[in-house]
Amino acid sequence: MDAQAAARLGDEIAHGFGVAAMVAGAVAGALIGAAVVAATAATGGLAAVILAGSIAAGGLSMFQIVKGLTTIFELPEPTTGVLIRGSFNVYVNSRNAMRAGDDVSATCSGLPLNHPLWPFPVLIAEGSATVYINGKPAARLQSKMVCGAHIKTGSQNTFIGGPTERVAFVLDLEEWLHTGLEALGLAALAGGLLLAAMAGVAALVGVVAIGGLMMGGMALLGDLGDRLGPGYRDLFQGVAGMALLGFGPKLAGRRPAAVTSETAQRRAYLNNKFGRSGNLDHDINYRGNRETAAKFFKSKDIDPADAESYMNGLDFNHPVRVETLAPGKNLWQYQSPGAPQGNWYTLSPRVQPTELGINPMGTNRAANTIEPKVLNSYRTTQKVEVLRSTAAPTDDFWSVKGQSYPAKGGAQQLFSNEKGSFGLLPREGS
């Protein structure tokens, strides 16, 4: 550490504006983040990433702005206390020299926004690790007090060098808050990259490219600030950070360019085909559910054409998962009269056919008549792997030839092509 002015009896302590700046910036960031979430209709993980990133960016940017302005214009920090006592035999400028771990400030007001009035003596917690006075580290300008304040005035002609030694616990709210905001920002960055990766390679590349440009721009502003003098790096980077944050709601609420009817229809078709809704969190879940179903059908050697037909009967807006049923599990299945056992089962006999995406009527092929479907009961005879899903609203055109029935879907269903794992139970009274 560069040599700093020696602290003396009567020198002042201060907290500065760091905590107040970070709190104000974090509040502003939270409001801006909420506006972005509202403009994009983001939910879940995406909303959390936006809010966390906005809070961190707002707090850290405002801290840099205030720090830069204070340095450039030498803005006075409000005095919160005065050093008392001091060495009994070492003097600086005819005033008692101050020692860490021994000497104190009479009180500390905690202004602005650091802590309530500290009505009892406040110990000096830091000093030089190489210069000692009466066996104690010599206190100097910027040495911390146990309340988190620092010594703000010192000798004009006596300086003390060496690294800093801390001899007491410091209630450093400013440092803790700054570290917390940095951690929050890194967590938001990691979450954003994870969501982008789940959305696809193109999204991940775009996020990385934009992030790289922003970091490069901040580095250039910092270099420019260093050339102009102390404080300008913080000021330039802080202003840029708040400006980028302020543009967020405008960019999020920007209306897309007008498209032709043909383009709109093509876009709607692709969005429906690939489960794109504009809600990233929803889209990630949708694609994950679809991938789970596709992998299951492939693992069971289902013909690709049949698998695609089965996929059309699943509502990927709801969870899709693979489960293993134990022996003795009761299930039910609707079948046309005289038809063989199928692959789809329901968990409750109270579920209606239309809720399973099928017509309640079926064709009795032996009599060539249209009759209500029969509900048969089954019980698992061994462990069996099934696909649990929710039936999608669909038009059943296969139950009755020449008819299309609009089934509403919405019920839970299980799929398995291992028919030998399900034993048909006798009907009651038979």
Curated annotation (Swiss-Prot):
Membrane-spanning segments: 17-37, 46-66, 193-213
InterPro entries for the chain: Ntox46 (IPR028238), PAAR_motif (IPR008727)
Gene Ontology molecular function, alphabetical: NAD+ nucleosidase activity; NADP+ nucleosidase activity; toxin sequestering activity
One Gene Ontology term from the biological process aspect of the record: protein secretion by the type VI secretion system
Keyword list, A-Z: Hydrolase, Membrane, Transmembrane, Transmembrane helix, Virulence
GO terms for cellular component: membrane
Catalyses which reaction(s): NAD(+) + H2O = ADP-D-ribose + nicotinamide + H(+)
Principal location class: membrane
Secretion signal span: none
Subcellular location: Membrane
Enzyme Commission (EC) number: 3.2.2.5
Recorded topology in the membrane: Multi-pass membrane protein
Enzyme class: hydrolase
Protein's job: Type VI secretion exported toxin that acts as a glycohydrolase on bacterial target cells and degrades the essential dinucleotides NAD(+) and NADP(+), thereby inducing bacteriostasis. The activity resides in the C-terminal region that is initially neutralized by the cognate immunity protein Tsi6.
Subunit: Interacts with Tsi6, VgrG1a, EagT6 and EF-Tu.
Protein name (Swiss-Prot/TrEMBL): NAD(P)(+) glycohydrolase toxin Tse6
